[in-house]
């Protein structure tokens, strides 16, 4: 029964991605199914959404049991002389799937809320996604890689209400006990690439 439920959740979430959105601040930055830190992490993310401009965000995340909460904020400077946007958001992540012999991936539900603030047209983002991946690395080593996919549905409110879908693909590289490097890309209505570096506690 548990196996059937897991497959149903995965199937429904992946089917949303077929329509092909982004995470809490509208940038193509996504989450692995589990955290790299024990207590908390702090770092920075640079994003290039839709090949149009660049965004810089500071990120902080802390743990509460199997749940962790992340806060992020920064600035997005679009190309073409458009006005800059202030980005503010929060994300929560909860592990819901543990790999088995029948299903090889771990999974976490990722939910968020955030906004991009601009004088002539702010937007609210409410993403809900399922991150699926698996930690890999040499035995007895602190170096690990977590490749993952995160199909996500996102509600966007910006004068009207829109439901969009995105598929996030990424990898987290834990290079030491204190440092993690990350890359992710969005496929869909919001394309682009994000690069991140965080320090772990």
Where does each model-flagged region fall?
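Metabolite-binding pocket within alpha/beta catalytic cores that recognizes anionic/polar moieties
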Residues: 74-75, 87-89
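Cleavable N-terminal export/targeting peptides
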Residues: 1-37
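Outer-membrane beta-barrel transmembrane domain signature
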Residues: 23-43, 48-52, 64, 80-81, ...
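N-terminal, post-signal-peptide region of Sec/Tat-exported proteins
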Residues: 49-77
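Active-site-adjacent beta->alpha loops and helix N-cap segments on the catalytic face
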Residues: 84
């Amino acid at each position: 029964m548990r196996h059937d439920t897991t497959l149903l959740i995965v199937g429904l979430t992946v089917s949303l991605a077929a329509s092909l959105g982004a995470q809490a601040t509208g940038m193509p930055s996504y989450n692995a199914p589990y955290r790299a830190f024990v207590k908390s992490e702090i770092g920075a993310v640079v994003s290039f959404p839709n090949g149009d401009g660049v965004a810089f965000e500071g990120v902080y995340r802390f743990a509460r049991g199997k749940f962790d909460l992340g806060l992020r904020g920064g600035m997005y400077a679009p190309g073409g002389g458009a006005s800059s946007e202030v980005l503010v958001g929060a994300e929560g992540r909860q592990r819901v799937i543990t790999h088995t012999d029948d299903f090889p991936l771990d999974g976490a539900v990722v939910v968020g809320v955030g906004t991009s603030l601009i004088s002539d047209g702010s937007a609210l983002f409410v993403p809900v996604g399922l991150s699926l991946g698996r930690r890999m690395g040499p035995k007895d080593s602190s170096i690990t890689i977590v490749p993952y996919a995160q199909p996500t549905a996102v509600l966007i409110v910006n004068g009207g209400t829109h439901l969009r879908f995105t598929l996030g693909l990424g990898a987290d590289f834990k290079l030491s006990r204190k440092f993690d490097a990350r890359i992710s890309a969005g496929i869909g209505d919001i394309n682009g690439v994000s690069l991140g570096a965080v320090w772990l506690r």
